């Protein structure tokens, strides 16, 4: 072919537009939501030379083969666990069903694959220092098995401290398993993992599928943060492993985040969630430990593990159920506020029912496009009667929901489409007034350090900023 021919450029543009039409049709047939399909199809049709490559990286939602493979792996894992008598939860599950507060969340028993269980102990861990002090102290006491899973692990001061601790426990004969997300931890050097492997730690990356093409996929990430030590103590929440989570990022410091420490029968659910992800990555089961006995009292907890391979959109349905069940208040904190139409409508309806609806979001951006889209949704929420606050001291990264007087949820799920439909997430639902009071006290402290967004803020926003926000919202279904 004569690349200098005057027709070559025209042929090339024609081919790109043809590929754009094919990709647009692909998006229409495969993207789960109408908003997402439109957000992809229109630019693919009109400006494919700008959107084809981003669609290959961020879109390509026909992951039916991937979803089928993930479900098959989960099935194989549970078959392998069948002989372990892994769910001796009858008494704890029956006790949980008697709770009136949990009964108000009528969809939860069927929404989660794991039951609500009684007789757990929970402890609120506010910010990075308290969280990692508790995690490191628990690992120090490990005797048998340590399970560690994070979306992000950095090879910095905190990451190296975790590495050395895990190496020391492995040298003592403890079985150590580490799982991290390949995209979230893209900056983690291979030498970090190799040092752990050489020291006897089993470490693997969570990837979507094998193959050259899929290495460019950034969807279907594993956003979960789980640590379980000897089946006796566990941790989940919003922190990853990096110095910024200790407030050492100058532009985002102080970092505001929340974790929860857990003991009791619900730890079996955390281990089961880890086992599913580990089995997907390795086709092997990690050791799973149940204590000989549980305490006779404690709080009700339910682990809500969600992901794109679920038969239904577990994460978004949880937010809907939590908001619809509220009779007095629903407070939500999230670093990203990009609700879909159903969740946004639920928030508006809650306001009309007289519920105290509050949303706490950051005042500083870590992703500018997401921040712009969040800002527009915040302005619209304020006009609908939702009280929206911006946390002032530093970057807010916690993911917390408080419903009425008894129900709270802390985990890894953000209030955005990525958590709703693309990421693997885990949230701990707790039904207990005393713990909810602690969460309320924590959030009240946050609100005192926040500035409430007003209708005037929207009117005072420059038109160019408003235009940027609206463009960001157009692509919000694919953010």
From Swiss-Prot:
GO BP of this protein: cardiolipin biosynthetic process
Compartments, as annotated in UniProt: Cell inner membrane
GO CC annotations, alphabetized: plasma membrane
Main location group: membrane
SMART domains documented for this protein: PLDc
Membrane topology according to the record: Multi-pass membrane protein
GO molecular function (one): cardiolipin synthase activity
Ranges that cross the membrane: 8-28, 38-58
Sequence ranges assigned to domain PLD phosphodiesterase in this UniProt record: 218-245, 392-419
EC number: 2.7.8.-
NCBIfam families: bac_cardiolipin
Family membership noted in the UniProt record: Belongs to the phospholipase D family. Cardiolipin synthase subfamily. ClsA sub-subfamily.
Record-given protein name: Cardiolipin synthase A
Protein source organism: Pseudomonas putida (strain GB-1)
Lineage of source species: Bacteria, Pseudomonadati, Pseudomonadota, Gammaproteobacteria, Pseudomonadales
Recorded name of the encoding gene: clsA
């Amino acid at each position: 072919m004569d690349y200098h021919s005057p027709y070559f450029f025209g042929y090339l543009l024609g081919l790109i537009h043809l590929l754009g039409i094919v990709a647009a049709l692909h998006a229409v047939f495969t993207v789960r939501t109408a908003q997402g399909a439109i957000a992809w199809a229109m630019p693919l049709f009109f400006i494919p030379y700008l959107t084809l490559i981003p669609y290959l990286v961020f879109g390509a939602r026909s992951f039916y083969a991937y979803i089928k493979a993930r479900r098959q792996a989960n099935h194989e894992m549970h078959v392998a666990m069948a002989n372990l008598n892994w769910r001796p939860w009858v008494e704890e599950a029956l006790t949980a069903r008697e709770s009136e507060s949990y009964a108000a969340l009528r969809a939860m028993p069927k929404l989660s694959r794991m039951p609500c269980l009684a007789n757990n102990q929970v402890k609120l861990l506010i910010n990075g220092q308290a969280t990692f002090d508790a995690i490191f102290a628990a690992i120090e006491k490990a005797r048998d098995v340590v399970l560690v899973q994070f979306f992000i692990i950095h090879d910095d001061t905190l990451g190296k401290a975790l590495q050395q601790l895990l190496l020391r426990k492995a040298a003592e004969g403890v079985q150590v398993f580490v799982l991290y997300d390949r995209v979230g931890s893209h900056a983690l050097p291979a030498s970090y993992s190799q040092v752990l492997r050489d020291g006897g730690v089993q470490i693997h990356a969570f990837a979507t599928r094998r193959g050259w093409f899929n290495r460019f996929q950034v969807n279907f990430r594993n956003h979960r943060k789980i640590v379980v030590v000897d089946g006796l103590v566990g941790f989940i929440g919003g922190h990853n492993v990096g110095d910024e989570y200790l407030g050492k990022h100058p532009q985002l410091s102080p970092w505001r985040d929340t974790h929860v420490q857990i003991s009791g029968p619900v730890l079996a659910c955390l281990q089961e969630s880890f086992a599913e992800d580990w089995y997907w990555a390795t086709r092997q089961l990690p050791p799973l430990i149940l204590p000989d006995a549980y305490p006779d009292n404690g709080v009700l907890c339910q682990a809500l593990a969600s992901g794109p391979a679920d038969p239904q959109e577990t994460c978004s349905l949880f937010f809907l159920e939590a908001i619809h069940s509220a009779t007095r208040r629903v407070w939500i904190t999230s670093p990203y506020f990009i609700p879909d139409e159903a969740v946004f409508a639920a928030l508006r309806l809650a306001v009309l029912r007289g519920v105290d609806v509050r949303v706490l979001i950051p005042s500083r951006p870590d992703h500018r496009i997401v921040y712009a889209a969040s800002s527009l949704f915040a302005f619209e929420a304020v006009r609908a009667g939702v009280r929206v606050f911006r946390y002032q001291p530093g970057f807010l990264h916690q993911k917390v929901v408080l419903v009425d007087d008894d129900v709270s949820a802390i985990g890894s799920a953000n209030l955005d489409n990525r958590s709703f439909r693309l990421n693997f997430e885990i949230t701990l639902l707790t039904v207990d007034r005393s713990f909810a009071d602690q969460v309320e006290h924590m959030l009240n402290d946050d609100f005192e350090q926040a500035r409430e967004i007003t209708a005037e803020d929207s009117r005072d926003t420059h038109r160019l900023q408003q235009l940027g926000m609206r463009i960001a919202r157009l692509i919000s279904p694919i953010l």
